[in-house]
Curated annotation (Swiss-Prot):
Belongs to the MnmA/TRMU family. InterPro entries: MnmA-like, MnmA-like_C, MnmA-like_central, MnmA-like_central_sf, Rossmann-like_a/b/a_fold. It catalyses: S-sulfanyl-L-cysteinyl-[protein] + uridine(34) in tRNA + AH2 + ATP = 2-thiouridine(34) in tRNA + L-cysteinyl-[protein] + A + AMP + diphosphate + H(+). This is tRNA-specific 2-thiouridylase MnmA. Keywords: ATP-binding, Cytoplasm, Disulfide bond, Nucleotide-binding, RNA-binding, Transferase, tRNA processing, tRNA-binding. Residues 94-96 are annotated as: Interaction with target base in tRNA. The active site is at 99 (nucleophile), 195 (cysteine persulfide intermediate). The keyword Amino-acid biosynthesis does not apply. GO terms for cellular component: cytoplasm. It comes from Stenotrophomonas maltophilia (strain R551-3). NCBIfam families: PRK00143.1, trmU.
């Protein structure tokens, strides 16, 4: 068996299957590696065994070696423990970003090199380009599927060793290729959500690790009690589904939206205005920012930002602070910018990097704050 030059992360899905097929067609010495990132908990909801069988079938059809690695311990320590800690603190984390940084482009890359591969490849909708001595992360050609948002924590060494073989494809073209070459995964549905939750009810799953208690749902304007919630951990800013608020005397028969939560007092705040001013922000401050180039383009610059996946680009001004965090000022007010989620910055199609959102200047968030406002500290 020849040593592979490229190790493809085969997930058992159609995207990684076509990625592997394209590399084989290009004459690369390819092998596939399936990562198990979540230990089977007996629920039958995380279909790792089905995915592994599909990955084996794809590698068999393509005539490439198949490898397996169990990264469930690494995932638990590097991703899941952080996921739980963030929810316990009342924030809304993004485990896919951490999974890419801590598992797929760290432990998978290490395993590939141990097996003799020079580079890795995945089925992400993104592109890599080289400009001089610098490696760039670019959005995928299919903007509706672009996954650069989840890859913004990658660095120069990782990008130099990474291929994204399907980054130039539209999803419809990828499906057609998979069907035309009879890949076993050509009709397989795209995976959605978080693997360790699968098809389970999110509240049921989270409740196994973070026991929650019921509390009051209040109107932030007058403090009146609207209803009762099953646990503040289960809700995020801007959320409408799952509140189960029936008719409220003296209130219109209209939907309610989460506009804030106070973990310390176990209170959820709601409003009937989808774009409630309680959760509109003009500025945010981040945790320490990561720059794909190794440094920011300037101490102060203009670019566009996304504060959630698939959000339209929003023009903003970025100021890099002395502690490595960034202060972002948006050109227009933003709805439901959520601490714990990822701020990702772009210059056109080039992903500059990003950071975890630490705080915003939304009125209700500022009112509930028990520590000095990070914006007042800057002003001082």
């Amino acid at each position: 068996m020849s040593t592979p030059r490229v190790m493809v992360g085969v997930s058992g899905g159609v995207d990684s299957s076509v990625a592997a097929w394209r590399l084989v067609q290009q004459g690369e010495a390819v092998a596939g590696l399936f990562m198990q990132n979540w230990a089977d908990d007996g629920s039958g909801e995380c279909r790792a065994e089905d995915d592994r069988r599909d990955a084996v079938a794809v590698c068999g059809l393509l005539g490439i070696p198949f490898h397996f690695r169990d990264f469930s311990n690494e995932y638990w320590q590097g991703v899941f423990e952080h996921f739980l800690a963030e929810y316990a603190a009342g924030r809304t984390p993004n485990p896919d970003v951490l999974c890419n940084r801590e598992v797929k482009f760290k432990h998978f890359l290490d395993a590939a090199r141990e097996l003799g591969a020079e580079r890795i490849a995945t089925g992400h909708y993104a592109r890599v380009a080289q400009r001089g001595h610098q490696w760039l992360l670019l959005r995928g050609a299919d903007r509706s599927k672009d996954q650069s948002y989840f890859l913004h924590q990658l660095g120069q060494q990782q990008l130099a060793a990474t291929l994204f073989p399907i980054g130039d494809l539209e999803k419809t073209d990828l499906r057609r290729i998979a069907r035309d070459v009879s890949l076993p995964t050509h009709a397989k549905k795209d995976s959605t959500g978080i693997c360790f939750i699968g098809e389970r009810d999110f509240r049921e799953f989270l409740g196994r690790y973070l026991p929650a208690k019921p509390g009051q749902i209040l109107d932030p304007a007058d403090g009146s009690v609207i209803a009762e919630h099953p646990g503040v951990f289960y809700f995020t800013l801007g959320q409408r589904e799952g509140l189960n608020i029936g008719g409220v005397r003296g209130r219109p028969a209209a939907p309610w939206y989460v506009v804030g939560k106070d973990v310390a007092s176990n209170v959820l705040y709601v409003d009937q205005d989808r774009d409630s001013t309680w959760m509109l922000s003009n500025r945010l401050r981040s945790e320490t920012a990561h720059w794909i180039a190794g440094a920011p383009p300037a101490r102060r610059f203009e670019c566009t930002a996304q504060t959630r996946y698939r959000q339209p680009d929003e023009p903003c001004t970025v100021e890099v602070l002395d502690d490595g965090s960034v202060l972002v000022t948006f050109a227009r007010p933003q709805r439901a910018v959520t601490p714990g989620q990822s701020l990702v910055l772009y210059d056109g199609d080039v992903c500059l990097g990003g950071a975890v959102i630490a705080a915003t200047d939304a009125p209700l968030e500022q009112r509930l704050r028990t520590t000095p406002s990070p914006f007042e500290v800057i002003a001082a």
